[in-house]
Amino acid sequence: MVASSFAVLRASRLCQWGWKSWTQLSGPPPLSTGGRTTFARTNATLSLEPGSRSCWDEPLSITVRGLAPEQPVTLRAALRDEKGALFRAHARYRADAGGELDLARAPALGGSFTGLEPMGLIWAMEPERPLWRLVKRDVQKPYVVELEVLDGHEPDGGQRLAQAVHERHFMAPGVRRVPVRDGRVRATLFLPPEPGPFPEIIDLFGVGGGLLEYRASLLAGKGFAVMALAYYNYDDLPKTMETMRIEYFEEAVNYLRGHPEVKGPGIGLLGISKGGELGLAMASFLKGITAAVVINGSVAAVGNTVCYKDETIPPVSLLRDKVKMTKDGLLDVVEALQSPLVDKKSFIPVERSDTTFLFLVGQDDHNWKSEFYAREASKRLQAHGKEKPQIICYPEAGHYIEPPYFPLCSAGMHLLVGANITFGGEPKPHSVAQLDAWQQLQTFFHKQLSGKS
């Protein structure tokens, strides 16, 4: 299907490159000028499948037809986030002998990426504003992606041959979004479109607080009831996280277990970064946590005290002399936390847990030593006769392992540090990690919460 919505294009505020018709640009065949072949306008069309909309974690089929045989072209893609920040990518290609370009078969010859990367125009996007992370704030509205085909291999100089817009949604058709204000609990519950009951998951993000819903909303389209849970800096919750009381998270667990559309009896936890650390603490202190996925989490309390009833876990010490400066002027804090093997009181008591764990680890995580933490958690669990957790490590993947096709955020502001730090990762291997991790965590939760293989 050829995407063709000028109304959406105008609304996206992305169209900065003119308004000539892109659906069918006609002209003479290639001309020979002094031994150099040039390509004039063609009847090029840019086709996307699915056509005008898809979910963010779905792959796109991108095809250009009506080009001249072996015509060199540049494809570029752009989107704006809710704050107006521009993200874009481009790649150079060559049409086949029939004048067709299929990104599933044609390798990129250069640009933001190279090689056979059908989704490279999405995952390789970079922010125009330095150190800016793509974060979806409103899952009820899509990202609008503009794609263009330009003649030649100059990303800003070639004549536009075709253009399309495509909506990337974060809620599959029929997914239900239910705001939750129950006691102290502040959250949003996402339910699949079909009748329940459903296996249930609590989803936790990291430092920065607020309520991020995009991972929960996408997972609800996979058959899970997912509660995106805020725990600070949101609504009437505490503005800081000096003390994390697990009783708050216990309230959230009890709310979800009592919901009429959840299957029970056990709950799944999904947490990244600080959310992974809190997931480990919840699994250690609370009953009914059947399965937990920890994405680049810490096995020690970091930056704040963790409390449950009369127990207190102090944060690990900071080693300020271990902070380094990169050649790009960023702080590297990967060595800046004392080992929980030294600060033993800061080690979260995972040995108390009866939870089945999956650790997803970026081996180039520079936020902290995620692989070390996962392996130390595994050692402690096994030393106490508990089930050996699964650990999946991703070479050259950084800290923020997101749902598929999110661009890598390799550096940015760390609110606890108060400065820009490196988060690690390389774009291509990080994108591979995100795609695999997304499938791994779904398979894990389906098996542990529903008994599906």
From Swiss-Prot:
<dbReference type="GO" id="GO:0006637">
    <property type="term" value="P:acyl-CoA metabolic process"/>
</dbReference>
<dbReference type="GO" id="GO:0052689">
    <property type="term" value="F:carboxylic ester hydrolase activity"/>
</dbReference>
<comment type="pathway">
    <text>Lipid metabolism; fatty acid metabolism.</text>
</comment>
<protein>
    <recommendedName>
        <fullName>Acyl-coenzyme A thioesterase 2, mitochondrial</fullName>
        <ecNumber>3.1.2.2</ecNumber>
    </recommendedName>
</protein>
<keyword id="KW-0809">Transit peptide</keyword>
<comment type="similarity">
    <text>Belongs to the C/M/P thioester hydrolase family.</text>
</comment>
<comment type="subunit">
    <text>Monomer.</text>
</comment>
<comment type="function">
    <text>Catalyzes the hydrolysis of acyl-CoAs into free fatty acids and coenzyme A (CoASH), regulating their respective intracellular levels. Displays higher activity toward long chain acyl CoAs (C14-C20). The enzyme is involved in enhancing the hepatic fatty acid oxidation in mitochondria.</text>
</comment>
<keyword id="KW-0378">Hydrolase</keyword>
<dbReference type="GO" id="GO:0005759">
    <property type="term" value="C:mitochondrial matrix"/>
</dbReference>
<dbReference type="GO" id="GO:0000038">
    <property type="term" value="P:very long-chain fatty acid metabolic process"/>
</dbReference>
<keyword id="KW-0276">Fatty acid metabolism</keyword>
<dbReference type="GO" id="GO:0036116">
    <property type="term" value="P:long-chain fatty-acyl-CoA catabolic process"/>
</dbReference>
<dbReference type="GO" id="GO:0001666">
    <property type="term" value="P:response to hypoxia"/>
</dbReference>
<keyword id="KW-0007">Acetylation</keyword>
<dbReference type="GO" id="GO:0070849">
    <property type="term" value="P:response to epidermal growth factor"/>
</dbReference>
<feature type="modified residue" description="N6-succinyllysine">
    <location>
        <position position="447"/>
    </location>
</feature>
<dbReference type="GO" id="GO:0052816">
    <property type="term" value="F:long-chain fatty acyl-CoA hydrolase activity"/>
</dbReference>
<dbReference type="GO" id="GO:0031667">
    <property type="term" value="P:response to nutrient levels"/>
</dbReference>
<dbReference type="InterPro" id="IPR016662">
    <property type="entry name" value="Acyl-CoA_thioEstase_long-chain"/>
</dbReference>
<dbReference type="InterPro" id="IPR029058">
    <property type="entry name" value="AB_hydrolase_fold"/>
</dbReference>
<feature type="active site" description="Charge relay system">
    <location>
        <position position="365"/>
    </location>
</feature>
<dbReference type="GO" id="GO:0006631">
    <property type="term" value="P:fatty acid metabolic process"/>
</dbReference>
<feature type="transit peptide" description="Mitochondrion">
    <location>
        <begin position="1"/>
        <end position="42"/>
    </location>
</feature>
<dbReference type="Pfam" id="PF04775">
    <property type="entry name" value="Bile_Hydr_Trans"/>
</dbReference>
<dbReference type="GO" id="GO:0009410">
    <property type="term" value="P:response to xenobiotic stimulus"/>
</dbReference>
<keyword id="KW-0496">Mitochondrion</keyword>
<dbReference type="GO" id="GO:0009725">
    <property type="term" value="P:response to hormone"/>
</dbReference>
<dbReference type="GO" id="GO:0001676">
    <property type="term" value="P:long-chain fatty acid metabolic process"/>
</dbReference>
<dbReference type="InterPro" id="IPR042490">
    <property type="entry name" value="Thio_Ohase/BAAT_N"/>
</dbReference>
<keyword id="KW-0443">Lipid metabolism</keyword>
<feature type="active site" description="Charge relay system">
    <location>
        <position position="273"/>
    </location>
</feature>
<dbReference type="GO" id="GO:0047617">
    <property type="term" value="F:fatty acyl-CoA hydrolase activity"/>
</dbReference>
<dbReference type="GO" id="GO:0005739">
    <property type="term" value="C:mitochondrion"/>
</dbReference>
<dbReference type="Pfam" id="PF08840">
    <property type="entry name" value="BAAT_C"/>
</dbReference>
<dbReference type="InterPro" id="IPR006862">
    <property type="entry name" value="Thio_Ohase/aa_AcTrfase"/>
</dbReference>
<feature type="active site" description="Charge relay system">
    <location>
        <position position="399"/>
    </location>
</feature>
<feature type="modified residue" description="N6-acetyllysine">
    <location>
        <position position="83"/>
    </location>
</feature>
<keyword id="KW-0719">Serine esterase</keyword>
<dbReference type="InterPro" id="IPR014940">
    <property type="entry name" value="BAAT_C"/>
</dbReference>
